[in-house]
């Protein structure tokens, strides 16, 4: 059986903690590993992640130090295999491209952002070119249906498998009916973070054109840190279009329960990112019967359509009647069978890890 080492190669606390807790709390019980799953993790706050006793974890304080350790391990033991969860570490892509990490050692669960090329800055355009070259050398790619479609268009000869991120979900939260708001005013959730990929200002203009200034807008911008300049730009644009009392720009990180309460108050989600992201928030909205608008360039719509989840596309006509009908359709869905919901994605992980460990061809 192949020695398998899981790699979280960038310091993304929320996502990394979700993966680690999923392995520690769920997969260890579901699969019954012969040995503790091995993880190599970048983090500046070990205490946040170091509560998974069922895992064998090695921590690194930088992307560079982790990459050096991965490369050293790959070169010293060509029979070991790495399962990269997401991949925002330039050094690891370059190691794959140069052959320091071999194709059969590099299995990858793509998280969306690392497939797409948003920035126009010269240094990023150069990196995108090198990353495209490296991605054709991956041994096996796991991703959502839409991202597999995108990847296979560029690299048709690389083996792929469907796999969903282990979104933190509680099936008991799924509601059967929605309570109408007393004042009848629509509440719209704009974006899933303060990242520029949400295209907040463009979305604000589109929302104003569709609904005027008589809707409530909630914009969560607590993540990423040190983002005040962009937050100010979004706030200025929002105030030029909507009344202050109809705006709620959240500038701090929220506790998970507070975030759930916020989502329950919404009537519509608006996500303009031109790539797959925000699946966690989308899953929660589906649980709460809240429809949403996506960019057609966010290929997760393929997964949604496959699971019969109603989707609005940015640029299409939209009014309160269409939204109410989408809410009705969403509430009538059997949400217990949606493939990317917990616990349904567990079987995909069982199969993926069996393949990666050489137990399944």
From Swiss-Prot:
Pathway: Bacterial outer membrane biogenesis; enterobacterial common antigen biosynthesis
Molecular function terms, GO-annotated: 4-acetamido-4,6-dideoxy-D-galactose transferase activity; fucosyltransferase activity
GO BP annotations listed: enterobacterial common antigen biosynthetic process; fucosylation
Its EC number(s): 2.4.1.325
Subcellular location: Cell inner membrane
Database matches in NCBIfam families: PRK02797.1-2
Family, per entry: Belongs to the glycosyltransferase 56 family.
Name used for this protein in its record: TDP-N-acetylfucosamine:lipid II N-acetylfucosaminyltransferase
Organism per entry: Photorhabdus laumondii subsp. laumondii (strain DSM 15139 / CIP 105565 / TT01) (Photorhabdus luminescens subsp. laumondii)
Gene: wecF
